[in-house]
């Protein structure tokens, strides 16, 4: 499990550094962040994404939260974003695996390996594109564990951060 995550993060980071901005949707957020701070219309961006040309589509908070990456060199920003998202997700998988192990047969390593085996192939495309879905899925996994343990404030903070990044978290 952990070796597969390490390899995935390493490969995705190398690709992001070698081919910054290629097959990336995260640049839409960074452009919006720069436009926000320049008092420009961030919904008027026409950055090319995997889906074609479209402007920024999300809550303004996600652009503001993207600010630290918006001013880094593109390759560095792409690499940091992907490594951060995948790390948050892998850690979330580990926390969920530990929770499942408490209530079933097998240790957390087994459940983490199984989740990794099933999850990594389905998330590789999003990781390569710099999708925010990676980090919000990780935030939801962390929130799930915190909800189980009745850590209400921490779960609420994680879910609020997820909603700020992408409104899809509202479903959770």
Predicted segments with their positions:
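Residue-level signature of the transmembrane alpha-helical core
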Residues: 83, 115-118, 142-143, 157-161
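Membrane-interface alpha helices of multi-pass inner-membrane proteins
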Residues: 153-172
């Amino acid at each position: 499990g952990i070796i597969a995550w390490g390899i995935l993060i390493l490969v995705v980071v190398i690709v992001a550094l070698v081919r910054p901005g290629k097959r990336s949707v995260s640049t839409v957020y960074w452009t919006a962040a720069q436009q926000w701070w320049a008092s420009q219309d961030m919904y008027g961006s026409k950055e090319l994404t995997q889906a074609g040309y479209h402007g920024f589509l999300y809550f303004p908070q996600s652009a503001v939260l993207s600010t630290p990456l918006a001013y880094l060199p593109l390759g560095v920003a792409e690499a940091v974003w992907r490594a951060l998202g995948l790390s948050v997700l892998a850690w979330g998988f580990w926390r969920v695996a530990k929770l499942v192990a408490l209530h079933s047969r097998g240790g957390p390593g087994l459940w983490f390996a199984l989740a990794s085996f099933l999850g990594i192939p389905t998330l590789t495309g999003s990781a390569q594109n710099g999708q925010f879905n990676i980090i919000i899925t990780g935030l939801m996994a962390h929130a799930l564990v915190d909800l189980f343990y009745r850590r209400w404030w921490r779960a609420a903070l994680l879910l609020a951060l997820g909603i700020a990044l992408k409104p899809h978290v509202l479903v959770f």
